[in-house]
């Protein structure tokens, strides 16, 4: 069975959480596949920067992992770190992201495509 791994961040600022909407309509957190010779933290920082243009400070002690089987039958591991914005101007990666929003926690939970 093929194994895929993605890393990203749950970004909190002023009691709001940042969600992205992918061009396929799925809402979630900024994340992406781990590249060769890249750590989980490096992947998370890179993906957040690529997808949202912001810089984050990751709390590596706050790490959440999900494991599931994809529609294609691959084993998928998603690692998310808690992070806060420390710089950059929010803008979306137009090729992959259709929308970015800061939402209160309740709205974010209701918007998430994968719960």
Task: Enumerate the predicted regions with their spans.
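Unchanged
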Residues: 34-115
């Amino acid at each position: 069975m093929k194994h895929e791994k993605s890393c990203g961040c749950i970004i909190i600022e002023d009691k709001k959480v940042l969600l992205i909407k992918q061009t396929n309509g799925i809402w979630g957190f900024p994340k992406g596949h781990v590249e060769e010779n890249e750590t989980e933290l490096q992947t998370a920082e890179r993906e957040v920067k690529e997808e949202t243009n912001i810089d984050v400070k990751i709390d590596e002690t706050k790490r959440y992992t999900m494991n599931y089987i994809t529609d294609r039958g691959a084993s998928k591991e998603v690692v998310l770190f808690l992070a806060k914005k420390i710089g950059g101007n929010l803008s979306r990666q137009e090729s992959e992201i259709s929308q970015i929003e800061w939402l209160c926690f309740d709205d974010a939970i209701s918007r998430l495509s994968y719960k």
